[in-house]
A protein has these predicted regions:
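Conserved N-terminal beta1-alpha1 strand-loop-helix module at the mouth
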Residues: 1-205
């Protein structure tokens, strides 16, 4: 069965409050903290406002692209439970993990089987491996069947243009589903009705 879900790219207090107060809240809520090209990016002032909201049963995740020391220093005292990191070597991940004492979600971008195999380099330096599509937020998909060869003990999170109607396809998979764009009414604007439908669908599977 599905292990849980993450809603990523939340950028306003009203939506965040709705999400954490939902009867079936996501296990993870993600915030884009240094990818300024993203329509979901939140600056430090807004980030502090958002993270002052009680997370209740959810875990807060800071999404970081590359080993951005400046950003890591700015957010080090914020109540993130996890850092989700793209484009860092295992050695860089170890340093970040030790310095900031955060749990780590390593994000790998997937196009083929060789990309998937890279998880072996990170399995000992992260709590969760996120298998995402190429292209940073471009709502691209990849063949999720490529993950069938990933060892069972790996905590797997998957992203890549997952829509609400796709959720049932994963009912026999032990994945954490990571969604963002499919829950929006327009780029960067989350839709409460879509969020509600998604969370209820995941819960009822």
């Amino acid at each position: 069965m599905i292990k849980g879900c993450k809603i990523c790219g939340i950028s306003d207090p009203k939506t965040l409050t709705y999400v954490v107060d939902h009867p079936h809240p996501p296990q993870f809520v993600g915030f884009i903290v240094n990818w300024k090209a993203s329509s979901r990016y939140v600056d430090l002032v807004r980030l502090k406002e958002l993270l002052s909201i009680d997370k209740k049963k959810s875990k807060y995740v800071g999404v970081i692209v590359k080993n951005d020391e400046s950003t890591l220093e700015k957010i080090k005292d914020l109540p993130f439970d996890y850092y989700q990191i793209y484009d860092c070597s295992p050695k860089e991940i170890i340093k970040i993990k030790e310095k900031y004492n955060k749990k780590i979600i390593v994000a790998l971008t997937i196009e083929n089987k060789e990309d998937v195999k890279k998880y072996k380099e990170y399995e000992n330096v992260s709590e969760i491996i996120l298998f995402d599509s190429k292209g940073y937020e471009k709502s691209m998909s990849f063949d999720h069947n490529l993950l069938d060869e990933v060892e069972d003990h790996i905590e797997k999170m998957i992203a890549g243009n997952i829509k609400i109607e796709d959720v049932t396809n994963f009912k026999n998979k032990h994945y954490i589903l990571d969604v963002s764009g499919s829950l929006e009414s327009s780029k960067g604007i989350k839709d409460i009705n879509k969020i509600d439908k998604f969370l209820n669908t995941v819960h009822n599977i």
